[in-house]
């Protein structure tokens, strides 16, 4: 039986999954957010915006996705179906705990991709997703159709010959954020994965393929956030995703581009601007 506890939830298969929450102190919440972290990250990614939203009477729950953080087998790619199932479970548990108020999904990077394919699954099953809207921050939609052929070929070869080999990303000279102090703290955090298996990168790419395709089915209220200085998810696949979103949902969709924004928008030096934009969008619902 799935249950939601103070610091974990029990998944459908009995796995104990860590959970963090940020709740309003002196008033009942007027809305609730489920925050889904990015690749190699974990639930603590939403600590600062979670505190901010709590001050605005918005409750937030975040959990370590399987294969990440303090979950069993951290570093091992769990597969897209497992990621979707866990998010579906958390949605049901949080909805049961907070009935009658709006529930939104926030997904950063890989978390955004998981949110997208979860909504797509509900549409494919001809059922309404039990959420009132989604917030996508630099969603991971860099699918193979927008990658150069040599990149996809090298990834396929590596995944099928040395799947357990680990990559560090050192030497790539990529900035995930302009908040250097925060990046250094992540480097010291033992729950942030530093060496990534090749087969996990392959699995992530499969997820990004699915997320880019899922854009066609995201017909619900949306807030999409993207930094023009993002060096992780290129502009081209992001623009392709935006072009694929259904015309029917355009009136209830807002896109914000941050001229000085990097990939980790909520943790950038201008992160508080992003938090306020999220809170304003939720308040206006």
What are these regions (language model features)?
Residues 1-25:
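N-terminal cap/lid segment of alpha/beta-hydrolase-fold proteins
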Residues 40-43, 69-99:
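Catalytic nucleophile-loop/oxyanion-hole region of alpha/beta-hydrolase
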Residues 50-74:
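Conserved alpha/beta-hydrolase
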Residues 110-197:
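Alpha/beta-hydrolase-fold enzymes
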Residues 218, 224-226, 230:
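Short beta-strand/loop motif that positions the catalytic acidic residue
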Residues 220, 234-244:
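Short alpha-helix in the alpha/beta-hydrolase fold that links the catalytic acid
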Residues 229-233, 264:
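Acidic catalytic loop of the alpha/beta-hydrolase fold
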Residues 252-285:
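Catalytic active-site module of serine/aspartate enzymes centered on a nucleophile-bearing elbow/loop
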């Amino acid at each position: 039986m799935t249950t939601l506890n103070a610091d974990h939830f029990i998944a459908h298969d009995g796995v104990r999954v860590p959970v963090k929450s940020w709740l309003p102190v002196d008033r009942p919440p007027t809305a609730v957010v489920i925050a889904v972290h990015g690749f190699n990250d974990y639930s603590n990614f939403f600590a600062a915006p979670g505190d901010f939203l709590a001050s605005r009477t918005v409750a937030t729950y975040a959990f370590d996705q399987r294969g990440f953080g303090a979950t069993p087998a951290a570093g091992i790619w769990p597969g897209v179906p497992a990621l979707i199932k866990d998010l579906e479970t958390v949605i049901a548990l949080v909805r049961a705990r907070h009935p009658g108020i709006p529930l939104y999904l926030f997904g950063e990077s890989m978390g955004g991709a998981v949110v997208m394919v979860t909504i797509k699954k509900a549409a494919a099953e001809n059922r309404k997703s039990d959420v009132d809207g989604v917030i996508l921050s630099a969603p991971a939609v860099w699918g193979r159709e927008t990658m150069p052929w040599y990149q996809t070929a090298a990834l396929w070869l590596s995944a099928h010959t040395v799947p357990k080999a680990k990559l560090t990303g050192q030497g790539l000279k990529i900035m995930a954020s302009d908040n250097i102090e925060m990046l250094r703290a992540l480097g010291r955090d033992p729950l942030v994965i530093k060496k990534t298996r090749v087969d996990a990168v392959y699995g992530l790419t499969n997820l990004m393929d699915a997320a880019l395709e899922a854009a066609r089915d995201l017909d619900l209220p949306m807030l999409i956030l993207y930094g023009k200085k993002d060096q992780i998810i290129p502009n081209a696949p992001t623009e392709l995703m935006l072009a694929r979103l259904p015309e029917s949902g355009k009136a209830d969709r807002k896109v914000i581009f941050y001229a000085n924004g990097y990939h980790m928008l909520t943790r950038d030096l201008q992160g508080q601007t992003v938090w306020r934009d999220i809170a304003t969008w939720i308040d206006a619902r």
